[in-house]
Amino acid sequence: MTLYEELKARGLVAQITDDEIIDLINNGKATFYIGFDCTADSLTAGHFMALTLMKRLQMAGNKPIALIGGGTTMIGDPSGRTDMRKMLTKEDIAHNAACFKKQMEKFIDFSDGKALMLNNADWLLNLNYVELLRNVGACFSVNNMLRAKCYEQRMEKGLSFLEFNYMIMQSYDFYYMFQHYGCNMQFGGDDQWSNMLGGTELIRRKLGKDAYAMTITLLTDSQGKKMGKTAGNAVWLDPNKTSPFEFYQYWRNVGDSDVMKCIRMLTFLPLEQIDEMSTWKDQRLNEAKEILAFELTKMVHGEEEAAKAQNAARALFSGAAGDAEHMPNTQLTEADLTDGSIGILTLMVKAGLAASNGEARRLVVQGGVLVDGEKVAAPTVCFTAEQLSKGIVIKKGKKVYHKVSL
């Protein structure tokens, strides 16, 4: 199987500009870049797709360029946003870029020129505005730019001229690196398609040469929103922001319908193994979730931390690695049950996790209650004597755990 065939089989390919891309990446002849706007001091789960793609391509002999958007971050990418980003100082951007580099080195080999890390501030901040308008601005049609998908939402609430320049700046990045670093391809999220086409067209018009672009499928949460630092629900790669245990638990708790998609797209497990896992059902889906969580935690935090997180999670949720003896617990009696079962609301009140049924209901409806690692679907959920005899672990919010048994 070729590299491109594998990327397709993993569901990573969204759009490509030309079929020439296939031969380039399959034969290790691509020098490609992916851009990272450093709007926070840590990468997030939203960057996972880009990082693992860079690793896959580098393993096949292609050369990655990780472009830190020190210059474009000062403008802000309007793609998929309904408001304007907060402006960052040069000092903030420099600090964030340094943090990014440490995290990227876990995925990409920068030794001996096998990969490059560049900062577009090195060329964007020195541009002469009048020369940019004459030499670059003349290559862009305002009519076409206004039709670009990346501006749709912002047009409704007001698109600043600052943000309107983002496409030109990103296109100039590609143009500059094509000339100075032999960069002939750009990869990015599917929401970047318009910006990426701007770069290939600028190179064609200014240099008369071909450059290529491919978009990868976006990683979205259960509400269909893009995961990462701007769409909420951020899961950070920095252990000081999201601990290895919390990181593990995030992936351990993905929905049944999402687990195989995540394994296929994010891990490096062989496709043959993934195809076999795709037939798993019921309890074996929990095993698949453990595999997903372990593989991704190992990738970010190392095998030792991944093993610790897995053991701790098993102790909390399944008892497979211990009984979580230091966890607060409540012992029920048969008298606490009605017709052999007890509802989640009553259970939470008895365990001291809620002051009233009303508070318990609100927590459940908001999705803040898990039992044995699974989100409680409705306030009407009940637990039988048989379930309670084995002991269950209730999680309220992010940090409150409580064991209940009969």
Predicted stretch roles:
Residues 1-32:
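Positively charged, low-complexity intrinsically disordered leader regions
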Residues 7, 44, 117:
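Divalent metal-coordination and catalytic microenvironments
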Residues 10, 89-90, 96-217, 221:
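Divalent-metal (Mg2+/Mn2+/Ca2+)-assisted nucleotide/phosphate chemistry catalytic cores
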Residues 50-57, 177, 195-203, 296, ...:
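Buried hydrophobic packing segments
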Residues 78-94:
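A charged helix-plus-loop insertion that forms the helical arch/lid used to bind
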Residues 81-86, 134-136, 230-231:
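Short, hinge-like loop/turn segments at secondary-structure boundaries
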Residues 203-406:
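Conserved nucleotide- and phosphate/pyrophosphate-binding catalytic cores
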